[in-house]
């Protein structure tokens, strides 16, 4: 997927944004932003005053220009939001093309019926073959296939989807490139992953986050204070003018202009654009966020919990070798291990079958012909296996599982693991592999080594997270020795071994109780409770449907190291909002000292050069020139900051104190200085052109 746009704003987006800019002038839409609503009402009122005066034969160039620039202020704020929404909508339009009328091959009994994909319901079984579009979200029941997911993820390379394990989920709208798979539909039409993506990336439907609401309330409060202050100015001006034998000349357009310049219009006009663009930047990195709150939380997380299988490792553990117990033939161990795995659809189970076949030429058998009863893996027992029957009676009971589970199983049968095999188990664990034990009846036959493969480049990425102040913890169901070896190889800070869904959930709640924000990355059904509890739950797109529904973010690339980009975007969002708020308030302070001296400089003196004129440090041309210059600057600063609001300020992994000082220097001091320079330049230009 192309992460960076060659053109900052593409032509189709620009055209639609301009159209939406005027559509957003609807009073109902304007009222959603209290600060800009004040500007909107001010523009309406000054426009009404201009036309009222014109009706009575009085033409005021000043009132006309004030009205126009107030309207420009509103339009520029609308344009900023429309551009942010348009960039997200471009992604939505491409997704909607994927959601076409797909004909599904629905399995009814033993027959296949062609039905519209829109009529499929949860639990329906469909068949997809090479060249077919998958008609809806589902889980693969049988088969393995190569799937083109470029319509969803933007990546051209096909991915493998197969039954069993954590790569069984398929997404509606993707295309099967090879083989044949049987799929059980898991989502109703209208609530599929594609439908969710379309709804999530449509900026117009984005809900404000709690921080945005709080900031909006703060800005509204400041605006109310300035409104009271401006309303009191005519009384003050009238009193001062009367004492000095002068007349106050504070017209309503001047007071409205002063109010608009003092309230924080800059951040108010860009606030929605900042939030929408944060979600849009995530989309460009192939991450879908279900809420703006999740992005904000990502910028503040302290601890990252990583599920090992499929997240830190490639997920497909492979059987590498057989280690028979004393007195057991290795070929016999391989034969029994294959029997226990014939009905095991997981990649690990199939690799055991293949290893036995490749090493000893043991061919697969049909369990049903052997009256075999498959015992599926259970998260509570951590064992699976098979019961072989003869004339309805169990004659062979085979089990395979992790060390502790088999150890407990043997203990109930009055048996234990020999010291020799314990040493073998420890050796396998210390090199980062997983030992799987095989038993027949009450006899331990030996150990299978399953090798985990750590994904490349993770160590460096975790080091970057450490610089950001984020602590990484690997969570795995493996024993402590295996977990320690993999944790060291991957470069995480800590690990939690022999974890169950309950212990994952407990770990997250413990850290949250200490005041930490926790992010969890996972892909399996057993990760779902932890993903739901986490402040930031990032589900892998290759994971199960349950995991994707539980998380509040979905990584379409299924790359756990992507969290670095997620964190940076979250921090960018918070820092950009804070920086522009600082800049906006500093602007207001500067405009206050720029305008008021020009307004009241003539008071207390018949010569119109009174004591207060000394405060007019900028030596602006006139009262009207000062007001108009400030209004023009106030309007132009919004489009000038749109690129920064959309791209976000550059984030570097520095300490919080250094970042604060840097932003105060750039946006605080800059926000104080720039208005003085800008207003003075505009004032000189107005004087040169003779507009005032």
From Swiss-Prot:
The active site is at 307 (4-aspartylphosphate intermediate). The keyword ATP-binding applies. It is a multi-pass membrane protein. Gene3D superfamilies: Calcium-transporting ATPase, cytoplasmic domain N (3.40.1110.10), Calcium-transporting ATPase, cytoplasmic transduction domain A (2.70.150.10), HAD superfamily/HAD-like (3.40.50.1000). ATP binds at residues 344, 348, 377-384, 400. Part of the high-affinity ATP-driven potassium transport (or Kdp) system, which catalyzes the hydrolysis of ATP coupled with the electrogenic transport of potassium into the cytoplasm. This subunit is responsible for energy coupling to the transport system and for the release of the potassium ions to the cytoplasm. This is Potassium-transporting ATPase ATP-binding subunit.
């Amino acid at each position: 997927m192309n992460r960076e746009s060659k053109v900052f704003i593409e032509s189709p987006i620009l055209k639609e944004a301009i159209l939406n800019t005027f559509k957003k002038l609807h009073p109902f839409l304007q009222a959603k932003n209290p600060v800009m609503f004040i500007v909107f009402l001010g523009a309406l009122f000054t426009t009404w005053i201009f036309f009222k005066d014109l009706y009575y034969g009085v033409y005021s160039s000043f009132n006309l220009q004030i009205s126009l620039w107030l309207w420009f202020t509103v339009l520029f704020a609308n344009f900023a939001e429309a551009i942010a929404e348009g960039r997200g909508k471009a992604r939505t339009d491409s997704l909607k093309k994927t959601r076409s009328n797909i004909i599904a091959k629905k399995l009814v009994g033993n027959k296949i019926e062609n039905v519209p994909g829109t009529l499929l319901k949860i639990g329906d079984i469909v068949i997809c073959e090479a060249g077919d579009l998958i008609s809806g979200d589902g889980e693969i029941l049988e088969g393995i296939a190569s799937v083109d997911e470029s319509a969803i993820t933007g990546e051209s390379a096909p991915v493998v989807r197969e039954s069993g394990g954590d790569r069984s989920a398929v997404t509606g709208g993707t295309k099967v490139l090879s083989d044949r798979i049987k799929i059980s539909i898991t989502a109703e039409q209208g609530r599929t992953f594609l439908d969710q993506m379309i709804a999530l990336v449509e900026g117009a439907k984005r809900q404000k986050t709690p921080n945005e609401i709080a900031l909006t309330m703060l800005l509204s409060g400041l605006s109310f204070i300035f409104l009271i202050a401006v309303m009191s100015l005519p009384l003050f001006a009238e009193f001062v003018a009367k004492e000095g034998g002068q007349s106050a000349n504070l017209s309503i357009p001047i007071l409205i202009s002063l109010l608009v310049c003092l309230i924080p219009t800059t951040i108010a006009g860009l606030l929605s654009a900042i939030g929408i663009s944060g979600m849009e930047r995530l989309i460009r990195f192939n991450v879908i966020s279900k809420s703006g709150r999740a992005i904000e939380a990502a910028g503040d997380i302290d601890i990252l919990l990583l599920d090992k299988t499929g997240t830190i490792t490639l997920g497909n553990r492979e059987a590498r070798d057989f280690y028979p117990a004393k007195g057991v033939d290795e070929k016999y161990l391989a034969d029994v291990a294959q029997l226990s795995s014939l009905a095991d659809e997981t990649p690990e189970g199939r690799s055991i079958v293949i290893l036995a076949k490749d090493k000893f030429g043991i061919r697969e058998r049909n369990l049903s012909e052997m009256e075999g009863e498959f015992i599926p893996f259970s998260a509570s027992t951590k064992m699976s296996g098979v019961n072989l029957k003869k004339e309805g009676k169990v004659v062979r009971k085979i089990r395979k599982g992790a060390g502790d589970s088999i150890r407990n199983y043997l203990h109930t049968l009055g048996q234990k693991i020999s010291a020799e095999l314990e040493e073998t188990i420890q050796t396998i664990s210390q090199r980062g592999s997983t030992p799987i034990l095989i038993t027949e009846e009450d006899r331990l036959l030996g150990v299978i080594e399953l090798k985990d493969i750590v994904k490349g480049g993770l160590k460096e990425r975790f080091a970057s997270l450490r610089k950001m102040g984020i602590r990484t913890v690997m969570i795995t169901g493996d024993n402590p020795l295996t977990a320690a070896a993999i944790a060291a190889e991957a470069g995480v800070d800590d690990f939690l071994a022999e974890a169950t869904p309950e212990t994952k959930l407990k770990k997250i709640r413990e850290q949250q109780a200490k005041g930490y924000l926790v992010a969890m990355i996972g892909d399996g059904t057993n990760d779902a409770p932890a993903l739901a509890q986490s402040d930031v739950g990032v589900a892998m797109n290759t994971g199960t449907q349950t995991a994707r529904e539980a998380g509040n973010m979905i990584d379409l690339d299924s790359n756990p190291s992507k969290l670095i980009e997620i964190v940076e975007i979250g921090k960018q969002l918070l820092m950009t909002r804070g920086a522009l708020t600082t800049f906006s308030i500093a602007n207001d302070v500067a405009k206050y000292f720029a305008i008021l001296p020009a307004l009241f400089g003539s008071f207390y003196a018949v010569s119109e050069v009174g004591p207060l004129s000394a405060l007019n440090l900028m030596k602006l041309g006139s009262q009207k020139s000062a007001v108009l210059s400030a209004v023009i600057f106030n309007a132009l600063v919004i489009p000038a900051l749109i690129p920064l609001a959309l791209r976000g300020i550059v984030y570097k992994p520095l300490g919080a104190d250094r970042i604060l000082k840097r932003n105060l220097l750039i946006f605080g001091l800059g926000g104080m200085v720039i208005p003085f320079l800008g207003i003075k330049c505009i004032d000189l230009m107005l004087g040169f052109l003779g507009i005032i």
